[in-house]
């Protein structure tokens, strides 16, 4: 996990129509629980209408580097009960009491899915790498360029927000 690690600004560019920042995090002295040397490069590009993130993971070791990428953005809505989400999936991930993946089950739902009074802490196998989110104030589309895509949805209690989390693997990826 690198969510709490210090990334270094490698490049910062501003243009007339967009801005870019490249962040780097590198591990040359690995820890016991993840004994691999690697470098992560994040390139954010911001325009008036979009935010793109390109992630590059570089193996700096002489052995294979197992990893899964996940991005955990939260999106606020004036009224989440009036919001909708749309994604293409026929499989939901089944987890044990510790949220460790144990199996899959069939998933079927009319799309777009209303978020009215819905509580989520669920993961899905995506058949198409696009997720659409519609709120009373704005709409957005999240896409991925990966071959295999997963989606984690999480709604914190008593908030008008949802975490829409695109991932390249499931939780506990080392064992799955």
Q: Where are the language model's segments positioned?
A:
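Active-site scaffold segments
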Residues: 52, 72-74, 161-167
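Active-site/ligand-binding surface loops and adjacent short beta/alpha elements
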Residues: 64-66, 74-145
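Active-site pocket scaffolds in enzymes
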Residues: 140-176
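Short coil/turn motifs at secondary-structure junctions
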Residues: 28, 49, 60-62, 76-78
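Structural motif
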Residues: 18-20, 50-52, 130, 139, ...
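Hydrophobic residues positioned within well-ordered beta-strands of beta-sheet architectures
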Residues: 21-23, 40-42, 53, 69, ...
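Short, well-ordered beta-strand segments enriched in hydrophobic/aromatic residues
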Residues: 44, 51-59
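Extended, loop-rich substrate-binding clefts of extracytoplasmic carbohydrate-active enzymes
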Residues: 1-47
